[in-house]
Amino acid sequence: MTPAARIVAMLGVVALVITVTSCSHHTTGKAASTTATSPASTTSLAPVAPVTGPALPPFIPSPGVGADCRYPPSTDPAGKPAGTPQTGKVATDPAGIGLTIVTDRGRIGLQLANNESPCTVNSFVNLAQKAYFDNTECHRLTTAHALSVLQCGDPKGDGTGGPGYQFADEYPTDQYPPGDPALKQPVVYPRGTLAMANAGPGTNGSQFFMVYRDSLLPPAYTVFGKINAAGLTVLDKIASAGVSGGGEDGPPATEVTITSARRD
């Protein structure tokens, strides 16, 4: 199955949705009239009008952050053997963890938000240490005005693969009460954001996306880190080549292979 984006139009607003391909997850919403700021592009990406919408909510820690990380089996088998990360309570100190993704297009430095999304970081670091991401392709590039991301982390390379387990959403989803209508309203995921793709609530696995231009998404995608300036330059170069075959969503025209991902 090829990667796909769900496009939903409501009240004149169009949102492209980041998903694991097997999902049928739909989101809708109307953007507000504020603008988030983010690091400027340093390459030849074509200029576009800034997206407008409310910013991600501030992180307010709760006693439950990192207190009980669980990784139950997913409905789909593992695309590559990975085992299960440490379960139960995980440390939120240090607050930030450095990790570098090395690709055949350059190095992408990450600062993982261990204090905000520790269960996600725990899984991501575990997968990296087990070489799970090594020799995998970043299978999806989106270049739409409201969604500009590179999606990676699938060992199958077609948008359907995962580690064989799943886990709950963290920041920013956990900043809202369950069932809050605001969870369906787009917010700005700023340039430089590292977040998880999913197939609906609580279905995080191994697929993640990197935002190279401010994008509008509902706050249903766990943010677990930031991309450094050098990494954004690499992403800009990949994005400037566009999508294979044209269009705004599909495999990147410049193939991207992760050769390694390791904690700094």
Q: Can you annotate each of these PLM segments?
A:
Residues 2-8, 12, 17-264:
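Cyclophilin-like peptidyl-prolyl cis-trans isomerases
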